[in-house]
Amino acid sequence: MAAGLLPSARAVLALLFLGLALLSVGPAPAQALHNVTAELFGGEAWGTLAAFGDLNSDKQTDLFVLRERNDLIVFLADQSAPYFKPKVKVSLKNFSALVTSVVPGDYDGDSQMDVLLTYFPQNHSNNELGAVIFWGQNQTLDPKNMTILNRTFHDQPLIMDFNGDLIPDVFAITNESSQPQILLGGDLSWHPALTTKSKMRDPHSRAFIDLTEDFTADLFLTTLSASNTFQFEIWENLGGNFSIRSVFEKPKNLVVVGQSAFADFDGDGHMDHLLPGCEDKDCQKSAIYLMRSGTGQWAPVLQDSSNKGTLWGFVPFVHEERPTAIPVPLTLHIGDYNMDGYPDALAILKNTSGSNQQAFLLENVPCNNASCEEVHRMFKVYWDLAGLNLIKDAMVATFFDIYEDGTLDIIVLSKGYTKSDVAIHTLKNNFEADAYFVKVIVLSGLCSSDCPRKITPFGVNQPGPYIMYTTVDANGYLKNGSAGQLSQSAHLALQLPYNVLGLGRSANFLDHLFVGIPRPSGEKSIRKQEWTAIIPNSQLMVIPYPHSVPRSWSAKLYLTPSNIVLLTAVALTGVCVFILAIIAILHWQEKKADDREKRQEAHRFHFDAM
């Protein structure tokens, strides 16, 4: 190349390297939330969101919304705006009832989603709940095809898989006995569940989740001791039978006790027990305690709830004999907002010196004080999250993957739409960072390729499966994560029928992903299967068929390109075009230089000849 071209080439190459440097830096993480309520619901954004599930088996999650005390409206996900449309309706108006809970599930084992409703009858003099099941047919609900259960409940039931047949069962205290009873799905027959001297707490926060690290869901109960002290019991699933393993009390400092929640808080692959509450009866001083798996010791992970001189606290549960609206206990809703592999939470806090209550994001961050040193992590309240702090009089806040892209967005319910109904707000999570995820849903496995009408039952909402992964993080260290599927069902638990597990900034394949399901009485071997080399940013649908032969289970993998991947593809295409342009320019300049040199050589030849 001619020497005269070097400066221009250096300039072009400098521009190229500058572009590549800017590409490698990428956009700064966005923290704001974008309100997309009108885009999702149009003018229908009201009612109490009570449950999630895929009613019509189209692999998109639908919303179950209660309106006007006794109507259930199912908003089906659609491809065009508004993206959730009210398509299915069933009503208990003839019962003059207040519906208190909605639990979708396949209660007869036909691979169609049914819906269990609990309700207060109009004359609820004994304060007990009635229950009715609307049966699914042709991927919808038939308002006339229903079964009224012949027993009433002392509290909202826990939906679990008691006998390991992967048909949901109903666990509750009924009017027939002070001992827990189980309504087995399929034949709808009642049986004694457990024999215990403990009295069940109301409102309870029972759970069906693996707490003994064997991939088999155990039974967690919230009870009262003989001295009326709050306590917790773990009934271990041993060979398909439940036997009591441990009993422990609440933290001594807590006066008001909220609903237990479960998450792999410290990212070690095992479930931890989170307990929100207050250290005084007026909730002037709120806290969240954590019991790490297997330790038996409580440690505070949130104690400071003041912001700029204003003290915020949890909203204590008020027990009403004759409620006029759905009671909402003190609850945390768990989800990995920023996909860093450490689950965050949403909570409702009230200004202790005023009347306003708002939803706040509690971010899971490394511990920075002595009290949480043992668990290494803590919650930090995100006080100024744009979008969330604009919603006043919030009642409930939960996570939901609105656009099925693996990012957990936020839904908030707030008072004030009407006297008996609330407003729905949906906030898109604009968090953009170099983080990855895997989304896992475990189906019932009641059928595989021979499902009725050839429709795979994506939406049967299966309680009990347990998921764990192991991978290597960006620094080369081993990283674990775990979650239980639909472990709680009562008191607006609002758990998703899938799990989104954050992987942090590691784009490595998941080395191992394990899935375990409940097993029936008498079966000693654990039902667990392992998959290897799972691609990040993918959705895995596990079909555990047949149940007792894990090596025969199948998994369908769906890739979900994130915005980062798409932006990178666009930027890479731009860089390639830029490089081709540079090559063309340099080639053209090289050709010009060669032509000039040839002319000079020709002139020199003629001069020498003369």
Swiss-Prot record:
One GO CC term on file: extracellular region
> What are the annotated glycosylation sites?
35, 94, 123, 138, 145, 150, 175, 241, 351, 369, 480
Start and end residues of the FG-GAP repeats are: 98-135, 153-183, 256-291
Organism superkingdom: Eukaryota
Q: How does it sit in the membrane?
A: Single-pass type I membrane protein
Q: Which InterPro entries match?
A: FG-GAP, Integrin_alpha_N, Tip
Signal peptide extent? 1-32
Keywords annotated in UniProt: Cell membrane, Glycoprotein, Membrane, Repeat, Secreted, Signal, Transmembrane, Transmembrane helix
Query: In which compartments does the protein localize?
Result: Secreted; Cell membrane
Cite the record's note on assembly: Interacts with RUVBL1, RUVBL2 and alpha-tubulin.
Q: Which family does it belong to?
A: Belongs to the TIP family.
Name assigned to this protein:
T-cell immunomodulatory protein
Naturally occurring in which organism (per UniProt) = Rattus norvegicus
Q: Gene for this protein?
A: Itfg1
